[in-house]
């Protein structure tokens, strides 16, 4: 076959290829094309590059013998039958084969090579022949094109359109042409005819090239005529031959189709047939669409194909047709985000659905999406390459550059500030300058010295940090909108005072700073605390003319709007709750006039405040919540976020909060995931490689450095110099026999009967945890739950009764309406006869999701069963599965719960020494049970008749006097009143506070207590950490003791070990709503495993530093299996464990310590009778047990109090804050004097000690004599001491006899 000139361009008009009976008819139609049309096409078509043409030819040549004839055996059979059967009608068929299939290795056996005479062969044997060049598929003009028809035309032009795609088309010719097919040993005449035909084709090619270069219409017409005549003569002389061509298809978008109307309801058989037919049509259309458009397979698909072949599926793949292969590839390609090959052939409706699917697919930066399989949860992933800095979004680079420039300016300014104002020899901070003149070196803005005296060093640094981050300088604040920061100081470090100081400085100097309005947004429980803190700290400032607006005091919206408008016009500080701000800042709020809405938008949004402070800012961690959206709409960029919850490992919270205070600093979410989250997360798996670990550390360091300019962290180690020590004990309690029986039945039988399934049931996990918690608390908890289920059934259809229910997290409007009598509902009138439900009364309480009943605050998954029609309980009630195992009289037996026994014993010991106790629980039902048994103890003390057994526990427990309860049902005013009454150190009767962890774990100050019981484990360990800081904060003067009670061998122990023991709670924030997605099948099976009876024997415990806890360990050996001291606020260090002999020796020393007489020079007891009368010269015996560490014979908390008194006496001009700062200095002086043998200060402390009337925690609580036997404390008196009279008054008790041989004026050697 003659080769054509690649540069030549044919100008013949292309006509449609039809199925006529001869090839000559097709040729004649092509010759009859108008010359003018061909001339215009040749003239208008510009020269094109031959790159794609050459690439196409190269691909075809590279295919070798893998041509169209090897596509499938079925096509060869059709072609052979068409060539050999002379009697059949002529046929012209087009076979379209994807290019990757042609380039692949042939699936049939290779045929033996043939001679040179086999060049002209049939279509079935033409695999060795080079394909015909120059054929092009041309589409008619758009005007003449039928939109609903698919037209294919054949052209001899070699031009390549950039938008078109090439396919090889095999065309079997009619029988007239195939009858002239040359065979082996052909005659000489046939060879001559072939040579003539080739010569004619060569001449036609030459004439075509001349026609393309011609610009004259006449010459072009003559050349076209000459070419046509020569081509006709050559075709007449040469016989027709089989022919192959390259067809190029162009994508044509289909017209929009109207959605089909909903068909009528059909029978099941017809519906199934219609569905099958529809699916087959969809598969067929997908196959055709894929074959017409997508001819290049991705590399991943080629690899999958090769793997499939190598695994033994080669024969199946060879016999499969295109329609069987393409739909599978179509489904895979749907998931590809970058591939859009078949989008033009899809209807618009399908394209939209396809787009919605792609949204769910994680992008390049979200490879660790939550939708992965459980198998991939704990395994490393192949993350994408980290985006380079130059490829980041423009806003990201601009924000990073702006932050870098700001930090450089602050560093330079700080160096100059240190040279001017900071004196290295100065110990106390005399002034805090926020801005100064660089030339004159004069202070332009400084903090009021009255407030400065109240600040600790870390608070001074915090105020300076907030100013630098938000304002930088006075000049910058006037020219730029400013930015924000996060003050991530630990709980109890005085973030409120820092904000008060900064706000006062800005508002007093409003002409310089330009700040008139400061907005404080906080949780509902801390709104009043903020107003109180502003009022109390302003007293120490020289200027206190700042107006503070507490909007929560006003209950109606018109008054709130009026006060907000007044604040906006007059200036000052406004305090709002998060929910109230969300309601008032809502543009679409109902019930407001247009003018009122405009006033609210002006005051709160645009222009809004000049500075906004968001307390407990971790509530803004989700940018999709309505509160986050409302706060983000504020125009001001000067935003301060306060949070005491550590953020080191919660990367998503990082992004949401940083995006709020420093927009675009971390880039888009996709960039943030790619640059930080994926590498850091990928290095935390057990199978992470060394490279993953290095990359994780590297990216963590970069993230820390990037954010240190806008986040300031201070942990609780800052408190250590100012607060007494803290000890935290994790106590593992055993289960009673009844609890073990209930637990075993639930795990083996009841769960299966109720449809329990471990695999993938996160909701079921929560429900089981709630039911099991009721078991290990006390069987009475099961009764409380059953009564609550009955209450829900009775009140499910009564909407009127729902108005009396109280929500655990209520809005301000609801809290205001329920503030009068809501808190009184938690104490039932039926305390004598058990719980209220047992006597027909129902406690009305609303759970977090609005359901009725006294359920748990975080338990929304209880099985309610069917609704009951009356008050009688259905026999098949699933909540009463426990009744066959528990008798009614056993419900009031306190010995069925080791946890309750330990709690009551702690209360008894604390009552004896005057310590106050807090009890935190996640469950409102657990608090109900504790209240119930306190009422039984009260009845036992007052000799009332009751059914039950509370042992030897006695005491008066009256709600509102002896103990308080704080949960979501209490209004803000009631919370404040209860906390104030409890914190009164002279009120020794108020000694217990029951608190719901979710409702009272934030924002309250209860430093009057120094002991905390965490009654149950929380899924979120940060809640327990918040509970600890209710007592361990500034203002605490006693050593703090924390007791975590955990049921041994149960799911509670598994949860604690997973969430707390293996991860420091200060560095972990877990979203409890995502727990079901964080547990795979193996994790769930581990949680459901239990060992109620330990396989090992109880070891001798280490002697605790808390002597009160040592008493309980000695008395209740069978209830406490083991314990360990664990500081949840610090990284744990490996310590050497004591041997068994060393532990026994320590306990023997402790027992001997309890029974011997102790000299006052060594120890001072908390018992009042251990201290004599100074007038009589009797310092008395220090008999009794020791409850704390001693320093020179004093308890550490007593010594701190005495040092405070001495400093106040020596320096009467100092305030309390300055006195506390001098305590370490006086303590060091005491050590030095005692080491040198000088007892001057020691004697002064002894004199102060003897003059104290009621030191905190020093004497026996006088209520002990009024309520119960004084010997109930369990302390043995020394030989020289006189025991107090039963029922006698403490103030008039008999003096203790002096210790033998003890002379007060003599200096004794200190142990």
UniProtKB/Swiss-Prot annotation:
GO terms for molecular function: ATP binding; ATP hydrolysis activity; ATP-dependent chromatin remodeler activity; DNA binding; DNA translocase activity; helicase activity; transcription coregulator activity. Residues 28-40, 181-202, 336-351 have a biased composition (Basic and acidic residues). SMART domains: DEXDc, HELICc. A motif (DEGH box) lies at residues 615-618. Residues 155-166, 290-306 have a biased composition (Acidic residues). Residues 114-125 have a biased composition (Polar residues). SUPFAM superfamilies: P-loop containing nucleoside triphosphate hydrolases. Residues 61-83, 219-237 have a biased composition (Low complexity). GO terms for cellular component: chromosome; germinal vesicle; nucleus. ATP binds at residues 489-496. InterPro entries: ARIP4-like, Helicase_ATP-bd, Helicase_C-like, P-loop_NTPase, SNF2-like_sf, SNF2/RAD54-like_C, SNF2_N. Transmembrane segments: none annotated. One of its GO terms (biological process) is glial cell migration. This is Transcriptional regulator ATRX homolog. It comes from Drosophila melanogaster. The lineage of its organism: Eukaryota, Metazoa, Ecdysozoa, Arthropoda, Hexapoda.
């Amino acid at each position: 076959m003659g080769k054509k000139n690649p540069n030549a361009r044919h100008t013949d008009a292309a006509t449609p290829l039809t199925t006529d009976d001869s090839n000559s008819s097709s040729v004649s139609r092509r010759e009859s094309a108008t010359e003018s049309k061909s001339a215009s096409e040749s003239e208008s078509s510009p020269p094109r590059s031959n790159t794609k043409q050459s690439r196409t030819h190269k691909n075809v040549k590279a295919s070798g013998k893998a041509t169209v004839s090897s596509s499938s055996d079925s096509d060869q059979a059709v072609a052979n039958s068409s060539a050999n059967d002379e009697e059949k009608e002529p046929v012209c068929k087009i076979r379209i084969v994807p290019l990757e299939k042609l380039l692949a290795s042939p699936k049939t056996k290779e045929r033996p090579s043939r001679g040179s005479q086999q060049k002209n062969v049939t279509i079935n044997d033409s695999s060795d022949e080079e394909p015909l060049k120059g054929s092009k598929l041309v589409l008619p003009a758009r005007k003449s094109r039928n939109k609903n028809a698919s037209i294919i035309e054949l052209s001899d032009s070699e031009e390549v359109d950039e938008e078109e795609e090439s396919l090889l088309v095999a065309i079997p010719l009619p029988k007239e042409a195939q009858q002239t097919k040359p065979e082996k040993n052909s005659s000489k005449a046939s060879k001559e005819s072939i040579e003539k035909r080739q010569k004619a084709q060569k001449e036609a090619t030459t004439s075509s090239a001349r026609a393309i270069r011609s610009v004259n219409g006449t010459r072009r017409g003559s050349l076209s005529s000459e070419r046509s005549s020569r081509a006709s003569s050559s075709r007449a002389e040469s016989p027709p031959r089989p022919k192959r061509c390259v067809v190029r298809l162009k994508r044509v978008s289909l017209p929009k189709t109207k959605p089909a109307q909903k068909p009528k309801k059909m029978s099941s058989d017809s519906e199934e047939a219609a569905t099958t037919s529809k699916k087959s049509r969809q598969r067929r259309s997908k196959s055709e669409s894929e074959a017409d458009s997508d001819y290049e397979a991705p590399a991943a698909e080629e690899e999958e194909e090769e793997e499939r072949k190598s695994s033994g599926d080669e024969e199946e793949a060879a016999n499969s047709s295109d329609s069987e292969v393409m739909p599978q590839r179509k489904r895979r390609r749907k998931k590809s985000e970058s591939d859009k090959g078949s989008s033009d052939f899809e209807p618009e409706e399908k394209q939209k659905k396809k787009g919605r699917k792609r949204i769910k697919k994680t992008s390049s930066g979200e490879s660790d999406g939550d939708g992965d399989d459980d198998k991939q949860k704990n395994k490393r992933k192949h993350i994408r390459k980290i985006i380079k800095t130059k490829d980041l979004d423009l806003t990201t680079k601009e924000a990073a550059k702006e932050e870098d420039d700001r930090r450089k300016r602050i560093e330079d300014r700080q160096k100059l500030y240190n040279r001017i104002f900071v004196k290295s020899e100065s110990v106390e901070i005399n002034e805090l300058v926020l801005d100064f003149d660089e030339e004159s070196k004069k202070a332009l803005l400084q903090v009021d010295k009255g407030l400065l005296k109240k600040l600790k060093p870390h608070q001074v640094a915090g105020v300076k940090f907030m100013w630098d981050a938000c304002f930088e300088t006075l000049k910058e604040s006037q020219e730029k909108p400013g930015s924000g920061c996060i003050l991530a100081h630990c709980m109890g470090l005085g973030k409120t005072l820092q904000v008060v100081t900064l706000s006062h400085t800005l508002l007093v100097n409003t002409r310089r700073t330009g700040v008139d309005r400061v907005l404080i947004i906080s949780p509902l429980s801390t709104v009043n605390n903020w107003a109180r803190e502003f009022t109390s700290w302003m007293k120490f400032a020289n200027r206190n003319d700042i107006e503070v607006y507490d909007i929560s005091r006003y209950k109606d919206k018109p008054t709130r709007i009026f006060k907000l408008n007044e604040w906006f016009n007059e200036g000052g500080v406004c305090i709002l709750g998060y929910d109230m701000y969300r309601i008032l800042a809502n543009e679409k709020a109902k019930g407001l006039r247009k003018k009122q809405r405009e006033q609210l938008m002006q005051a709160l949004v645009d222009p809004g405040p000049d500075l906004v402070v968001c307390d407990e800012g971790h509530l803004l961690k989700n940018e999709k919540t309505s509160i986050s959206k409302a706060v983000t709409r504020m125009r001001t960029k000067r935003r301060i976020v306060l949070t005491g919850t550590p953020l080191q490992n919660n990367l998503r919270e990082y992004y949401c909060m940083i995006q709020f205070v420093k927009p675009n600093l971390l880039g888009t979410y996709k960039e943030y995931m790619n640059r930080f989250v994926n590498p850091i997360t990928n290095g935390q798996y057990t199978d992470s490689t060394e490279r993953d670990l290095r990359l994780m550390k590297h990216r963590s360091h970069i993230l820390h450095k990037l954010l240190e300019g806008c986040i300031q962290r201070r942990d609780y180690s800052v408190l250590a110099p100012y607060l007494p020590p803290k000890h935290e004990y994790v106590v593992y309690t055993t289960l009673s026999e009844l609890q073990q029986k209930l637990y075993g039945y639930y795990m083996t039988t009841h769960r299966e009967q109720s449809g329990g399934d471990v695999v993938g049931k996160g909701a079921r996990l929560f429900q089981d945890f709630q039911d099991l918690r009721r078991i290990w608390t006390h069987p009475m908890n099961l009764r409380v739950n059953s009564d609550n289920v009955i209450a829900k059934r009775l009140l499910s259809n009564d909407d009127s009764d729902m108005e009396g229910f109280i929500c655990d997290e209520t809005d301000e409007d609801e809290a205001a309406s329920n503030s009068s009598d809501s808190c009184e509902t938690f104490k039932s009138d039926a305390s004598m006869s058990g719980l209220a439900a047992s006597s027909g009364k129902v406690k009305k309480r609303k759970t977090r999701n609005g359901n009725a009943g006294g359920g748990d605050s975080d338990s929304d998954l209880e099985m309610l069963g069917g609704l009951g029609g009356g008050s009688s309980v259905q026999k098949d009630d699933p909540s009463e599965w426990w009744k066959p195992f528990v008798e009614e009289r056993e419900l009031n037996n306190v010995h069925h719960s080791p946890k309750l026994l330990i709690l009551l014993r702690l209360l008894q010991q604390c009552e004896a020494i005057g310590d106050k106790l807090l009890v935190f629980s996640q469950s409102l039902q657990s608090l109900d049970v504790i209240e119930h048994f306190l009422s039984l103890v009260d009845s036992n003390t007052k000799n009332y008749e009751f059914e039950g057994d509370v042992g030897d526990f006695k005491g008066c427990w009256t709600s509102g006097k002896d103990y308080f309860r704080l949960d979501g049902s209490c209004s803000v005013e009631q919370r404040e009143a209860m906390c104030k009454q409890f914190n009164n150190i002279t009120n020794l009767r108020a000694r217990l506070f029951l608190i719901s962890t979710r409702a009272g774990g934030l924002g309250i100050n209860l430093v009057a207590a120094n002991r905390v019981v965490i009654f149950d484990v929380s899924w979120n360990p940060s809640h327990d950490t918040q509970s600890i800081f209710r007592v361990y904060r500034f203002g605490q003067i006693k050593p703090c003791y924390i007791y975590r009670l955990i049921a041994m061998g149960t799911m509670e122990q598994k949860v604690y070990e997973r969430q707390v023991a293996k991860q420091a709670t200060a560095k972990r924030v877990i979203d409890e709503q995502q727990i079901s997605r964080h547990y795979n099948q193996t994790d769930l099976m581990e949680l459901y495993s239990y060992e109620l009876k330990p396989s090992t024997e109880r070891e001798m415990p280490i002697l605790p530093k808390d002597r009160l806890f040592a008493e309980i360990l000695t008395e209740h050996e069978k209830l406490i299996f083991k314990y360990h001291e664990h500081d949840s606020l610090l990284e744990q260090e490996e310590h050497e464990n004591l041997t068994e002999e060393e532990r026994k020796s320590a306990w023997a020393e402790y027992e001997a310590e309890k029974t011997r007489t102790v000299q006052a020079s060594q120890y001072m007891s908390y018992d009042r009778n251990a201290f004599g009368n100074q007038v009589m010269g009797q310092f008395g015996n220090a008999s009794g047990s020791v409850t704390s560490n001693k320093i020179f014979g004093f308890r550490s908390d007593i010594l701190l109090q005495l040092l405070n008194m001495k400093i106040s006496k020596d320096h009467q001009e100092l305030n309390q804050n300055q006195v506390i700062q001098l305590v370490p200095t006086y303590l060091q002086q005491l050590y030095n004097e005692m080491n040198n043998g000088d007892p001057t200060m020691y004697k002064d402390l002894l004199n102060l000690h003897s003059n104290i009337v009621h030191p905190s925690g020093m004497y026996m609580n006088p209520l002990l004599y009024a309520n119960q036997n004084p010997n109930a404390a369990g302390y043995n008196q020394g030989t020289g001491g006189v025991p107090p009279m039963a029922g006698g008054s403490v103030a008039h008790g008999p003096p203790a006899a002096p210790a033998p041989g003890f002379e007060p004026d003599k200096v004794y050697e200190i142990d």
